Amino acid sequence: MNKPLIRTERNGDWLRFGVKVQPRSSRNQIVGEHEGDLKIKVMAPPVEGAANQALQKFLAELFKLPKKDIRIVRGETSRHKIVEIRGIEAEKLLAFIPQITK
């Protein structure tokens, strides 16, 4: 089965892509693709930026990068966000997406 397609683009040293965040989950995890965006569950609630901070921390730990290399450029108060990560290629991002079964 092919990997799902996540739309990505380069912005200088940064890799930009969309994320659909599902807060108040039982654990932090990438669950797949949603309409061309990466779907990620985070345990934190969507209160006072807690889910955004949890998303940044999760991605930083996953890719072994400092948190300063992960930024939310759009969607601070929305479940649909545009995220940029410095220091990775699209192939590395796509390698972390689990196989989706129909």
Curated annotation (Swiss-Prot):
<dbReference type="InterPro" id="IPR036591">
    <property type="entry name" value="YggU-like_sf"/>
</dbReference>
<dbReference type="Pfam" id="PF02594">
    <property type="entry name" value="DUF167"/>
</dbReference>
<dbReference type="GO" id="GO:0005737">
    <property type="term" value="C:cytoplasm"/>
</dbReference>
<comment type="similarity">
    <text>Belongs to the UPF0235 family.</text>
</comment>
<protein>
    <recommendedName>
        <fullName>UPF0235 protein Swol_0959</fullName>
    </recommendedName>
</protein>
<dbReference type="InterPro" id="IPR003746">
    <property type="entry name" value="DUF167"/>
</dbReference>
